[in-house]
Amino acid sequence: MAGSLLASHLAMAHPHGWIDMSVRVITDDNGVATGLHQTWRMDPFYSLVVFEELQQVPGGSMEEGLDQLGGEIRDNLAAQHYFTEVRIGSEKQSFGDVTEYTALERGGRLTFMFILPLASPQPLSGQVLEYQVFDPTYYIEMVHEEEGDEPSPQALILNGEPECALSVLPADPDPELVMQAALLDTDEEGEPGLGRHFAETGRVDCR
């Protein structure tokens, strides 16, 4: 039941919930990027709804329900490229299958953690890696973890060798798109790709 709720939550349009996220770019000892470790914290209201549904499953524990939910989230996201786009230089990167993931309760929030592997590991030396994580329909707003009004130092981390400049760039959507999104009801879908215009950009500059 919680899985179907999540599927519908992910399939609709414009910002009626949000996810606080943090990203760790994984590199090997040679400074080659191998993937992105992402942590998503669902908003408190949605988390409460999911936890209440899991508690109502007869004969099941919360831990078992979360294990099943993690697999359902992974499967739903796989069909949508995990809401993630990555570029290194001018080249858009493809992804491998997500096999490492978990769903858990942390501080009252439903938290989903997973490693998104690059299909082909890429050296970062002399390169700029940029990523965006967004719901294409903008039903869910994806934002990096914040401290005050600024991205948290833990919102983007580089794990591994190269010394690179890390930054999270804010979205700068056209005012007409902001109005378009605000006028959508919960049962209406936005234009395909609407969420891209509201996406923050994580940048790892190793030049």
Listing of model-derived features with the role each one plays in the protein:
Residues M1-S4:
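Sec-dependent signal peptide recognition
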Residues S8-L10:
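N-terminal signal peptide c-region/cleavage motif recognized by signal peptidases
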Residues P15-L48:
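Early extracytoplasmic/domain-onset interaction patches
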Residues G17-I19, Q80, S125, F198:
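Residues that act as N-cap/strand-start positions at coil-to-secondary-structure junctions
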Residues A33, H81, A199-T201:
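Sequence-level motif detector for i,i+2 pairs with an aromatic at +2
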Residues F45-L124:
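Structured domain cores in non-transmembrane regions
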Residues G89-R207:
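Mature, soluble, non-transmembrane domains
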